[in-house]
Amino acid sequence: MSRHFRTHTTSRLTFPSSSGGLAITRLPFSSTSSKLLLQQLSSTSPAAAATAVTITTSSPARNLQRARASAAEQGMEEHGKAAVGWAARDDSGVLSPYNFSRRAQKDDDVTIKVLYCGICHTDLHIVKNDWGNAMYPVVPGHEIVGVVTGVGAGVTKFKAGDTVGVGYFVASCRGCECCGNGYENYCAKMVTTCNGVDHDHGGGAATQGGFSDAIVVNEHYVLRVPAGLPLDSAAPLLCAGVTVYSPMVIHGLNAPGKHVGVVGLGGLGHVAVKFAKAFGMRVTVISTSPGKRQEALEHLGADEFLVSRDAGQMAAAAATMDGILNTVSAWHPIAPLFSLMKPMAQMVFVGGPTRPLELPAYAIVPGGKGITGNCVGGIRDCQAMLDFAGEHGITAEVEVIKMDYVNTAMERLEKNDVRYRFVIDVAGSSLAGSGDAKI
Protein backbone atom coordinates (compact mmCIF):
# COMPACT_ATOMS: atom_id res chain seq x y z
CA MET A 1 0.00 0.00 0.00
CA SER A 2 1.38 3.37 -1.00
CA ARG A 3 1.16 6.04 1.65
CA HIS A 4 0.67 9.74 1.04
CA PHE A 5 -2.19 13.31 1.76
CA ARG A 6 -5.72 14.75 1.56
CA THR A 7 -6.83 18.15 0.26
CA HIS A 8 -9.37 20.43 1.77
CA THR A 9 -11.89 22.65 0.09
CA THR A 10 -10.57 26.05 -0.78
CA SER A 11 -12.22 29.35 0.01
CA ARG A 12 -12.04 33.05 -0.78
CA LEU A 13 -12.40 35.59 2.01
CA THR A 14 -14.95 38.40 1.85
CA PHE A 15 -15.26 41.45 4.07
CA PRO A 16 -18.80 42.67 4.87
CA SER A 17 -19.14 46.34 5.75
CA SER A 18 -18.42 47.15 9.36
CA SER A 19 -20.95 48.76 11.65
CA GLY A 20 -20.74 51.09 14.61
CA GLY A 21 -17.08 51.88 14.03
CA LEU A 22 -15.97 48.59 15.53
CA ALA A 23 -12.42 47.47 14.86
CA ILE A 24 -13.47 43.87 14.38
CA THR A 25 -14.07 42.64 10.84
CA ARG A 26 -15.93 39.38 10.45
CA LEU A 27 -14.82 37.07 7.68
CA PRO A 28 -17.92 34.95 7.05
CA PHE A 29 -16.89 31.50 5.95
CA SER A 30 -19.96 29.36 5.44
CA SER A 31 -20.23 25.77 4.36
CA THR A 32 -20.35 27.11 0.81
CA SER A 33 -16.64 27.35 0.13
CA SER A 34 -15.25 29.09 -2.92
CA LYS A 35 -15.71 25.92 -4.94
CA LEU A 36 -19.44 26.04 -4.19
CA LEU A 37 -19.56 29.75 -4.94
CA LEU A 38 -17.98 29.15 -8.32
CA GLN A 39 -20.46 26.36 -9.01
CA GLN A 40 -23.33 28.62 -8.04
CA LEU A 41 -22.13 31.35 -10.41
CA SER A 42 -22.72 28.97 -13.29
CA SER A 43 -25.70 27.06 -11.94
CA THR A 44 -27.73 30.19 -11.21
CA SER A 45 -27.63 31.52 -14.78
CA PRO A 46 -31.00 31.42 -16.61
CA ALA A 47 -29.87 28.55 -18.81
CA ALA A 48 -28.46 26.56 -15.94
CA ALA A 49 -31.55 27.11 -13.84
CA ALA A 50 -33.56 25.10 -16.34
CA THR A 51 -31.57 21.97 -15.61
CA ALA A 52 -30.05 22.53 -12.18
CA VAL A 53 -31.27 20.17 -9.49
CA THR A 54 -31.22 21.10 -5.80
CA ILE A 55 -32.22 18.07 -3.73
CA THR A 56 -32.88 18.26 -0.02
CA THR A 57 -36.02 16.30 0.75
CA SER A 58 -38.20 13.76 -1.00
CA SER A 59 -41.16 15.41 -2.74
CA PRO A 60 -43.06 15.44 -6.07
CA ALA A 61 -41.01 18.47 -7.09
CA ARG A 62 -37.83 16.59 -6.28
CA ASN A 63 -38.99 13.66 -8.41
CA LEU A 64 -39.76 16.03 -11.28
CA GLN A 65 -36.30 17.56 -11.00
CA ARG A 66 -34.77 14.11 -11.09
CA ALA A 67 -36.83 13.24 -14.15
CA ARG A 68 -35.67 16.38 -15.94
CA ALA A 69 -32.04 15.65 -15.11
CA SER A 70 -32.51 12.06 -16.25
CA ALA A 71 -34.09 13.19 -19.51
CA ALA A 72 -31.17 15.51 -20.19
CA GLU A 73 -28.76 12.64 -19.56
CA GLN A 74 -30.73 10.29 -21.79
CA GLY A 75 -30.56 12.82 -24.60
CA MET A 76 -26.79 12.78 -24.29
CA GLU A 77 -26.64 9.02 -24.04
CA GLU A 78 -28.27 8.27 -27.40
CA HIS A 79 -24.97 8.49 -29.27
CA GLY A 80 -22.49 8.55 -26.38
CA LYS A 81 -19.92 6.19 -24.98
CA ALA A 82 -21.08 3.59 -22.46
CA ALA A 83 -19.46 4.11 -19.07
CA VAL A 84 -19.63 2.67 -15.59
CA GLY A 85 -18.84 4.45 -12.37
CA TRP A 86 -19.87 4.71 -8.74
CA ALA A 87 -22.56 7.26 -7.96
CA ALA A 88 -24.44 8.62 -4.98
CA ARG A 89 -28.19 8.63 -5.48
CA ASP A 90 -29.29 10.61 -2.43
CA ASP A 91 -27.88 12.61 0.46
CA SER A 92 -26.84 9.51 2.37
CA GLY A 93 -23.76 9.84 0.20
CA VAL A 94 -23.52 6.08 -0.26
CA LEU A 95 -21.86 5.21 -3.57
CA SER A 96 -22.73 2.17 -5.68
CA PRO A 97 -22.21 0.98 -9.28
CA TYR A 98 -23.88 3.15 -11.91
CA ASN A 99 -24.13 2.61 -15.66
CA PHE A 100 -24.36 5.76 -17.76
CA SER A 101 -23.06 7.24 -21.01
CA ARG A 102 -20.41 9.80 -21.75
CA ARG A 103 -21.12 12.28 -24.51
CA ALA A 104 -20.12 11.38 -28.04
CA GLN A 105 -16.55 12.47 -28.79
CA LYS A 106 -16.47 15.74 -30.75
CA ASP A 107 -13.74 17.13 -33.00
CA ASP A 108 -12.01 18.94 -30.14
CA ASP A 109 -12.54 16.21 -27.54
CA VAL A 110 -10.20 13.72 -25.91
CA THR A 111 -11.49 10.37 -24.65
CA ILE A 112 -9.64 9.16 -21.57
CA LYS A 113 -9.49 5.82 -19.80
CA VAL A 114 -9.38 6.66 -16.10
CA LEU A 115 -6.53 4.96 -14.25
CA TYR A 116 -6.57 6.76 -10.88
CA CYS A 117 -8.79 9.32 -9.21
CA GLY A 118 -8.13 11.11 -5.94
CA ILE A 119 -10.79 11.71 -3.30
CA CYS A 120 -11.12 15.35 -2.26
CA HIS A 121 -13.14 16.64 0.68
CA THR A 122 -15.26 18.44 -1.91
CA ASP A 123 -16.42 15.03 -3.16
CA LEU A 124 -17.74 14.29 0.32
CA HIS A 125 -19.65 17.58 0.43
CA ILE A 126 -21.17 16.92 -3.00
CA VAL A 127 -22.40 13.37 -2.40
CA LYS A 128 -23.95 14.35 0.93
CA ASN A 129 -25.54 17.46 -0.59
CA ASP A 130 -23.93 19.60 2.10
CA TRP A 131 -24.12 22.60 -0.23
CA GLY A 132 -27.69 21.95 -1.40
CA ASN A 133 -26.81 21.69 -5.10
CA ALA A 134 -26.29 17.95 -5.69
CA MET A 135 -27.71 16.59 -8.95
CA TYR A 136 -28.33 12.92 -8.27
CA PRO A 137 -27.20 10.47 -9.39
CA VAL A 138 -23.76 12.06 -9.12
CA VAL A 139 -20.41 10.42 -9.89
CA PRO A 140 -17.74 12.35 -7.91
CA GLY A 141 -14.07 12.85 -8.67
CA HIS A 142 -11.99 15.71 -10.10
CA GLU A 143 -8.42 14.50 -9.58
CA ILE A 144 -8.15 12.27 -12.61
CA VAL A 145 -5.13 10.61 -14.19
CA GLY A 146 -5.59 8.40 -17.22
CA VAL A 147 -4.49 7.46 -20.71
CA VAL A 148 -5.86 8.84 -23.98
CA THR A 149 -7.82 6.23 -25.94
CA GLY A 150 -9.22 8.48 -28.66
CA VAL A 151 -9.06 12.02 -30.02
CA GLY A 152 -11.31 14.10 -32.25
CA ALA A 153 -10.29 15.18 -35.72
CA GLY A 154 -9.43 18.69 -34.55
CA VAL A 155 -7.30 17.74 -31.54
CA THR A 156 -3.70 18.95 -31.84
CA LYS A 157 -2.25 18.56 -28.33
CA PHE A 158 -2.78 14.87 -27.61
CA LYS A 159 -2.75 11.45 -29.23
CA ALA A 160 -3.79 7.96 -28.21
CA GLY A 161 -1.50 6.56 -25.54
CA ASP A 162 -0.64 9.89 -23.88
CA THR A 163 -0.79 10.04 -20.09
CA VAL A 164 -3.02 12.92 -19.08
CA GLY A 165 -4.91 14.50 -16.21
CA VAL A 166 -8.19 16.31 -15.64
CA GLY A 167 -8.74 18.64 -12.70
CA TYR A 168 -11.54 20.58 -11.07
CA PHE A 169 -13.25 21.93 -14.19
CA VAL A 170 -13.88 20.84 -17.77
CA ALA A 171 -15.27 23.96 -19.44
CA SER A 172 -15.36 27.75 -19.28
CA CYS A 173 -16.48 30.51 -21.63
CA ARG A 174 -12.93 31.18 -22.95
CA GLY A 175 -14.02 34.70 -23.86
CA CYS A 176 -14.13 36.64 -20.59
CA GLU A 177 -11.34 38.58 -18.88
CA CYS A 178 -10.66 35.74 -16.44
CA CYS A 179 -10.29 33.16 -19.20
CA GLY A 180 -8.16 35.52 -21.28
CA ASN A 181 -5.78 35.99 -18.37
CA GLY A 182 -5.46 32.28 -17.66
CA TYR A 183 -7.86 32.16 -14.73
CA GLU A 184 -10.57 29.91 -16.11
CA ASN A 185 -11.14 28.79 -12.52
CA TYR A 186 -12.81 32.16 -11.86
CA CYS A 187 -14.91 32.24 -15.03
CA ALA A 188 -18.61 32.81 -14.29
CA LYS A 189 -19.44 30.03 -16.75
CA MET A 190 -16.88 27.54 -15.47
CA VAL A 191 -18.23 23.96 -15.49
CA THR A 192 -17.02 21.62 -12.78
CA THR A 193 -15.85 18.12 -13.65
CA CYS A 194 -18.64 16.58 -11.61
CA ASN A 195 -22.00 17.93 -10.50
CA GLY A 196 -21.87 20.72 -13.07
CA VAL A 197 -24.11 21.48 -16.05
CA ASP A 198 -22.40 21.46 -19.45
CA HIS A 199 -24.52 23.31 -22.01
CA ASP A 200 -21.90 23.89 -24.69
CA HIS A 201 -20.49 20.37 -24.94
CA GLY A 202 -22.80 18.11 -22.98
CA GLY A 203 -26.21 19.22 -24.19
CA GLY A 204 -27.20 20.52 -20.77
CA ALA A 205 -26.45 17.24 -19.00
CA ALA A 206 -24.99 16.96 -15.53
CA THR A 207 -21.25 16.30 -15.59
CA GLN A 208 -20.02 13.06 -14.03
CA GLY A 209 -16.57 12.76 -12.50
CA GLY A 210 -13.63 10.43 -12.32
CA PHE A 211 -15.02 7.67 -10.10
CA SER A 212 -15.65 5.98 -13.46
CA ASP A 213 -13.86 4.07 -16.17
CA ALA A 214 -13.78 6.78 -18.86
CA ILE A 215 -14.34 10.48 -19.46
CA VAL A 216 -14.63 12.71 -22.54
CA VAL A 217 -13.14 16.21 -22.18
CA ASN A 218 -12.41 19.15 -24.48
CA GLU A 219 -8.67 19.17 -25.15
CA HIS A 220 -8.24 22.68 -23.70
CA TYR A 221 -8.98 21.30 -20.22
CA VAL A 222 -6.80 18.20 -20.48
CA LEU A 223 -3.34 18.30 -18.89
CA ARG A 224 -0.19 16.41 -19.77
CA VAL A 225 1.23 14.35 -16.89
CA PRO A 226 5.05 14.32 -17.00
CA ALA A 227 6.79 11.00 -17.49
CA GLY A 228 8.31 9.65 -14.31
CA LEU A 229 5.65 10.85 -11.89
CA PRO A 230 3.94 7.93 -10.11
CA LEU A 231 0.41 8.11 -11.44
CA ASP A 232 -1.36 7.28 -8.18
CA SER A 233 0.38 9.95 -6.12
CA ALA A 234 0.24 12.46 -8.97
CA ALA A 235 -3.57 12.40 -9.06
CA PRO A 236 -4.14 14.71 -6.03
CA LEU A 237 -1.87 17.31 -7.61
CA LEU A 238 -4.74 18.07 -10.01
CA CYS A 239 -6.50 19.75 -7.06
CA ALA A 240 -4.27 20.01 -3.99
CA GLY A 241 -1.14 20.71 -6.01
CA VAL A 242 -2.47 23.60 -8.05
CA THR A 243 -4.42 24.98 -5.07
CA VAL A 244 -1.15 25.75 -3.29
CA TYR A 245 1.15 26.24 -6.30
CA SER A 246 -0.96 28.89 -8.02
CA PRO A 247 -1.18 31.40 -5.13
CA MET A 248 2.49 30.92 -4.32
CA VAL A 249 3.39 31.98 -7.86
CA ILE A 250 0.79 34.76 -8.03
CA HIS A 251 1.92 36.33 -4.74
CA GLY A 252 5.66 35.89 -5.21
CA LEU A 253 6.01 33.13 -2.63
CA ASN A 254 8.21 31.14 -4.99
CA ALA A 255 11.42 33.18 -4.76
CA PRO A 256 14.52 31.39 -3.41
CA GLY A 257 15.49 32.61 0.04
CA LYS A 258 12.11 34.04 0.96
CA HIS A 259 10.44 32.85 4.15
CA VAL A 260 6.95 31.36 3.90
CA GLY A 261 4.75 30.08 6.68
CA VAL A 262 2.43 27.14 6.02
CA VAL A 263 -0.48 26.94 8.46
CA GLY A 264 -1.73 23.37 8.83
CA LEU A 265 -0.09 20.11 7.86
CA GLY A 266 -2.78 18.15 6.06
CA GLY A 267 -3.61 17.40 2.46
CA LEU A 268 -2.88 20.91 1.25
CA GLY A 269 -0.22 21.78 3.80
CA HIS A 270 2.14 18.90 3.12
CA VAL A 271 2.06 19.58 -0.63
CA ALA A 272 2.69 23.29 0.03
CA VAL A 273 5.81 22.41 2.02
CA LYS A 274 7.11 20.28 -0.84
CA PHE A 275 6.58 22.98 -3.45
CA ALA A 276 8.02 25.73 -1.25
CA LYS A 277 11.18 23.72 -0.57
CA ALA A 278 11.54 22.98 -4.29
CA PHE A 279 11.30 26.74 -4.94
CA GLY A 280 14.27 27.18 -2.59
CA MET A 281 12.35 28.93 0.14
CA ARG A 282 12.74 28.87 3.89
CA VAL A 283 9.66 27.06 5.19
CA THR A 284 8.08 27.18 8.63
CA VAL A 285 5.16 24.88 9.39
CA ILE A 286 2.69 26.44 11.83
CA SER A 287 0.48 24.00 13.72
CA THR A 288 -1.44 23.57 16.95
CA SER A 289 -0.16 19.98 17.19
CA PRO A 290 3.37 19.56 18.59
CA GLY A 291 3.21 15.91 17.54
CA LYS A 292 3.56 16.91 13.89
CA ARG A 293 7.04 18.38 14.39
CA GLN A 294 8.94 15.26 13.35
CA GLU A 295 6.76 14.74 10.29
CA ALA A 296 7.25 18.35 9.19
CA LEU A 297 11.00 18.55 9.74
CA GLU A 298 12.28 15.06 9.05
CA HIS A 299 9.87 13.67 6.49
CA LEU A 300 8.76 16.76 4.56
CA GLY A 301 11.92 18.82 4.96
CA ALA A 302 10.52 21.99 6.54
CA ASP A 303 13.16 24.27 8.07
CA GLU A 304 11.25 25.15 11.22
CA PHE A 305 8.18 24.10 13.15
CA LEU A 306 6.13 26.55 15.16
CA VAL A 307 3.44 25.68 17.70
CA SER A 308 0.91 28.48 17.37
CA ARG A 309 -0.30 28.07 20.96
CA ASP A 310 3.20 28.70 22.33
CA ALA A 311 3.48 32.44 23.02
CA GLY A 312 7.25 32.27 23.30
CA GLN A 313 7.69 30.61 19.93
CA MET A 314 5.28 33.06 18.31
CA ALA A 315 7.14 36.06 19.76
CA ALA A 316 10.49 34.73 18.57
CA ALA A 317 9.19 34.40 15.00
CA ALA A 318 7.47 37.82 14.87
CA ALA A 319 7.82 39.80 11.62
CA THR A 320 10.01 37.17 9.92
CA MET A 321 7.75 35.82 7.18
CA ASP A 322 7.33 37.15 3.64
CA GLY A 323 3.93 35.52 3.41
CA ILE A 324 1.69 32.83 4.86
CA LEU A 325 -0.31 30.13 3.11
CA ASN A 326 -3.22 29.18 5.37
CA THR A 327 -4.48 25.69 4.51
CA VAL A 328 -6.67 25.04 7.57
CA SER A 329 -10.35 24.23 7.01
CA ALA A 330 -11.35 24.29 10.68
CA TRP A 331 -12.00 27.36 12.79
CA HIS A 332 -8.83 28.83 14.28
CA PRO A 333 -7.71 32.22 15.63
CA ILE A 334 -6.04 34.09 12.78
CA ALA A 335 -5.13 37.45 14.37
CA PRO A 336 -1.96 36.12 16.06
CA LEU A 337 -0.71 34.75 12.74
CA PHE A 338 -0.41 38.24 11.25
CA SER A 339 2.23 39.09 13.85
CA LEU A 340 4.51 36.60 12.11
CA MET A 341 4.39 38.52 8.81
CA LYS A 342 6.63 41.31 7.59
CA PRO A 343 5.01 44.62 6.59
CA MET A 344 3.13 44.44 3.27
CA ALA A 345 3.07 40.63 3.38
CA GLN A 346 0.02 38.62 2.31
CA MET A 347 -1.83 35.78 4.02
CA VAL A 348 -3.47 33.55 1.40
CA PHE A 349 -6.41 31.40 2.46
CA VAL A 350 -6.94 28.14 0.60
CA GLY A 351 -8.94 26.40 3.33
CA GLY A 352 -12.61 27.09 4.05
CA PRO A 353 -13.63 27.04 7.74
CA THR A 354 -17.37 26.78 8.21
CA ARG A 355 -17.44 29.11 11.22
CA PRO A 356 -16.83 32.86 10.84
CA LEU A 357 -13.31 34.03 11.60
CA GLU A 358 -12.64 37.27 13.46
CA LEU A 359 -9.91 39.67 12.41
CA PRO A 360 -9.15 42.82 14.44
CA ALA A 361 -8.27 45.66 12.08
CA TYR A 362 -5.13 46.41 14.10
CA ALA A 363 -3.69 43.07 13.00
CA ILE A 364 -3.37 44.23 9.39
CA VAL A 365 -3.63 48.04 9.24
CA PRO A 366 -0.37 49.11 10.96
CA GLY A 367 1.83 46.90 8.78
CA GLY A 368 -0.17 47.27 5.59
CA LYS A 369 -0.68 43.52 5.61
CA GLY A 370 -3.04 41.82 3.22
CA ILE A 371 -5.45 38.92 3.21
CA THR A 372 -6.71 37.10 0.13
CA GLY A 373 -7.98 33.74 -1.05
CA ASN A 374 -7.42 31.22 -3.81
CA CYS A 375 -9.48 28.49 -5.46
CA VAL A 376 -7.56 25.82 -7.41
CA GLY A 377 -5.90 27.37 -10.50
CA GLY A 378 -6.24 27.96 -14.22
CA ILE A 379 -5.14 25.55 -16.94
CA ARG A 380 -1.86 27.40 -17.50
CA ASP A 381 -0.93 27.26 -13.81
CA CYS A 382 -2.04 23.65 -13.50
CA GLN A 383 0.17 22.54 -16.39
CA ALA A 384 3.09 24.58 -15.04
CA MET A 385 2.56 22.96 -11.64
CA LEU A 386 2.63 19.46 -13.12
CA ASP A 387 5.76 20.25 -15.13
CA PHE A 388 7.47 21.65 -12.03
CA ALA A 389 6.40 18.61 -10.01
CA GLY A 390 7.84 16.35 -12.69
CA GLU A 391 11.16 18.18 -12.65
CA HIS A 392 11.43 18.03 -8.86
CA GLY A 393 9.74 14.70 -8.13
CA ILE A 394 6.89 16.23 -6.14
CA THR A 395 3.90 14.02 -5.40
CA ALA A 396 1.19 13.82 -2.77
CA GLU A 397 1.26 11.33 0.07
CA VAL A 398 -1.51 8.85 -0.69
CA GLU A 399 -3.29 5.76 0.49
CA VAL A 400 -4.34 3.77 -2.57
CA ILE A 401 -7.66 1.93 -2.45
CA LYS A 402 -9.94 0.06 -4.80
CA MET A 403 -13.44 1.19 -5.64
CA ASP A 404 -15.09 -1.33 -3.32
CA TYR A 405 -13.50 0.51 -0.39
CA VAL A 406 -14.74 3.96 -1.41
CA ASN A 407 -17.63 4.19 1.09
CA THR A 408 -15.32 3.27 3.96
CA ALA A 409 -12.81 5.78 2.66
CA MET A 410 -15.48 8.48 2.66
CA GLU A 411 -16.33 7.66 6.27
CA ARG A 412 -12.67 7.85 7.24
CA LEU A 413 -12.22 11.09 5.31
CA GLU A 414 -15.10 12.64 7.25
CA LYS A 415 -13.19 11.79 10.44
CA ASN A 416 -9.87 13.05 9.00
CA ASP A 417 -8.60 9.50 9.32
CA VAL A 418 -6.21 9.45 6.37
CA ARG A 419 -2.56 10.22 5.90
CA TYR A 420 -3.03 12.19 3.86
CA ARG A 421 -5.04 11.51 0.68
CA PHE A 422 -7.09 8.62 -0.68
CA VAL A 423 -6.60 7.68 -4.33
CA ILE A 424 -8.78 5.12 -6.10
CA ASP A 425 -7.11 2.61 -8.38
CA VAL A 426 -9.97 2.82 -10.86
CA ALA A 427 -8.44 0.72 -13.63
CA GLY A 428 -7.49 -1.98 -11.13
CA SER A 429 -10.95 -2.15 -9.60
CA SER A 430 -14.02 -4.13 -10.48
CA LEU A 431 -16.50 -1.31 -10.97
CA ALA A 432 -19.33 -3.83 -10.82
CA GLY A 433 -18.61 -4.05 -7.11
CA SER A 434 -16.50 -7.15 -6.56
CA GLY A 435 -12.81 -7.65 -5.87
CA ASP A 436 -10.36 -6.63 -3.20
CA ALA A 437 -11.30 -3.45 -1.38
CA LYS A 438 -7.86 -2.14 -0.58
CA ILE A 439 -4.31 -2.48 -1.87
From Swiss-Prot:
Q: Name one Pfam family in it.
A: ADH_zinc_N
Its pathway, per UniProt, is: Aromatic compound metabolism; phenylpropanoid biosynthesis
Q: What species was this sequence derived from?
A: Oryza sativa subsp. japonica (Rice)
Residue numbers binding NADP(+): 122, 243, 264-269, 287-292, 327, 351, 374-376
Recorded GO MF terms: cinnamyl-alcohol dehydrogenase activity; coniferyl-alcohol dehydrogenase activity; zinc ion binding
Keyword set includes Metal-binding = yes
Q: What is said about its interaction partners and assembly? A: Homodimer.
* Residues that coordinate or bind Zn(2+) 2: 173, 176, 179, 187
Recorded protein name is Probable cinnamyl alcohol dehydrogenase 8C
Task: Give the GO biological process terms.
Answer: lignin biosynthetic process
The record's section on Gene3D superfamilies has: Medium-chain alcohol dehydrogenases, catalytic domain (3.90.180.10), NAD(P)-binding Rossmann-like Domain (3.40.50.720)
The free-text note explaining how the cofactor binds reads: Binds 2 Zn(2+) ions per subunit.
Q: Where does Zn(2+) 1 bind?
A: 120, 142-143, 239
Q: CDD domains per the record?
A: CAD1
Q: What is its EC number?
A: 1.1.1.195
Keyword terms, alphabetized: Lignin biosynthesis, Metal-binding, NADP, Oxidoreductase, Zinc
The record ties this protein, via SUPFAM superfamilies, to: GroES-like, NAD(P)-binding Rossmann-fold domains
What this protein catalyses is: (E)-cinnamyl alcohol + NADP(+) = (E)-cinnamaldehyde + NADPH + H(+); (E)-coniferol + NADP(+) = (E)-coniferaldehyde + NADPH + H(+); (E)-sinapyl alcohol + NADP(+) = (E)-sinapaldehyde + NADPH + H(+); (E)-4-coumaroyl alcohol + NADP(+) = (E)-4-coumaraldehyde + NADPH + H(+)
Domain of life assignment:
Eukaryota
The UniProt function text for this chain reads:
Involved in lignin biosynthesis. Catalyzes the final step specific for the production of lignin monomers. Catalyzes the NADPH-dependent reduction of coniferaldehyde, 5-hydroxyconiferaldehyde, sinapaldehyde, 4-coumaraldehyde and caffeyl aldehyde to their respective alcohols.
Entry-linked InterPro entries: ADH-like_C, ADH-like_N, ADH_Zn_CS, CAD-like, GroES-like_sf, NAD(P)-bd_dom_sf, PKS_ER
Cofactors (names): Zn(2+)
